[in-house]
A protein has these predicted regions:
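Short surface loop/edge beta-strand patches of beta-sandwich-type extracellular domains
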Residues: 1-5, 77-78, 106-114
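Extracellular beta-strand elements of beta-rich domains used
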Residues: 14, 87-92
Length: 156
């Protein structure tokens, strides 16, 4: 992703914040900083948008949300690219979180209940579920399924 870090046998909190108008309103050389990546609450990367970019247009296509694999622009898996790892919490928010908010969520992930007005969806993945094809999120609006090789690791 443009930076490297060693995390073998360590839990790492990763947060990606995007806003086409500029995360925190930040603009660099007249171009909005559209993406910031935080690792363990510290800013690791900030990227400007392209100056010739088109405005974001939402669509109603059902595009799979994936973790630990690469996707092409058409939402197809890229070969056999994948990463081994564990995931404990996954949250998608409507609002672009500040660094302080990211650090708070990193320190208290259990504080996310599903009733937050700007939470789109979220999963707490610290215990096995009864159906790997229908894992309900915290909001009760969405479900996920596990595809490929996986194993549940409880309370890690």
């Amino acid at each position: 992703p443009g930076f490297s870090f060693s995390t073998l046998n360590q839990w790492v909190h990763v947060a990606v914040v995007t806003n086409e108008n500029g995360v925190d309103g930040e603009v660099r050389d007249g171009i909005p900083v559209m993406t910031k990546i935080y690792v363990n609450g510290q800013l690791m990367l900030s990227e400007r948008g392209r100056d010739d970019r088109l405005p974001y247009t939402p669509n109603d296509k059902e595009v799979a949300m994936v973790a630990f694999t690469g996707l092409s622009a058409t939402a197809n898996r890229i070969g056999e690219k994948s990463t081994n790892g564990c995931m404990r919490h996954l949250h998608i928010w409507k609002s672009a979180k500040t660094q302080a908010e990211i650090q708070h969520l990193m320190d208290t992930p259990e504080s996310v209940t599903g009733s937050e007005s700007d939470l789109v969806c979220g999963w707490t993945l610290n215990k096995t579920v009864s159906d790997n094809n229908n894992i309900k999120d915290l909001t009760g609006k969405f479900s996920a399924r596990l595809i490929g090789d996986f194993q549940w690791v409880e309370n890690r």
